[in-house]
Amino acid sequence: ACALTAALSGKPVLAEEWGGCTAPPGEPSQTWRWTALAGEREQFMASEEDLAVYVAQVLPRLVAAGATGALLWCFADYDESLHGTPPLTAFRHERHFGLVRPDGTLKPHAEAVRAFAATSPRVRRVDWTGLLDVTPDEYYRAPAEHAVRLYERYLRRGA
């Protein structure tokens, strides 16, 4: 997504509001299902350890893609005293997106961020213009038609 956005805009890209919601500490990855707002809800909840692996894999790839930074969503899980209040009643998974648990301890993916930062990664501009085989105007007229092909092209490039 960063490479495509950079290629279409010709501007640097910041990856923001990414990450994942986690299952309770010590529990494996799982799928939660519940009913809210007259509809069935389903959400994958990564184990804390699995999300740490994911974050550790994504951060260097963002650097390689030329992203100027990465803002994970979000700082801390909601305190349990707030779980019964809107919007957390309908969107249960939103309670658990934090880098920090309600008790103030860091989740493993926060440690993955710390370890990555310790490598002193350098932001570098990557020219993605060669990725496109259509103009931005052509792309935006039919994004679903172009996105899969351009992603496959990106993968063949060896990114």
State each model region's role.
Residues V53-A56, P60, E111:
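A generic structural signal for well-ordered alpha-helical surface patches
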Residues D50, Y54, W73-F75:
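Aromatic side chains
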Residues G66-A67, P121:
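Residue-level recognition of short, well-ordered coil/turn positions
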Residues W73-A159:
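Aromatic-rich peripheral "rim/lid" segments of glycoside hydrolase catalytic domains that contact
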Residues R33, L37, E42-M45, G84-L88, ...:
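Amphipathic, alpha-helical segments enriched in basic
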Residues A1, L37-A52, H96-T105, A112:
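The substrate-binding groove and active-site-proximal loops of carbohydrate-active enzymes
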Residues A1-G39, A56-L59, T68, D77:
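Glycoside hydrolase catalytic-domain groove-lining segments
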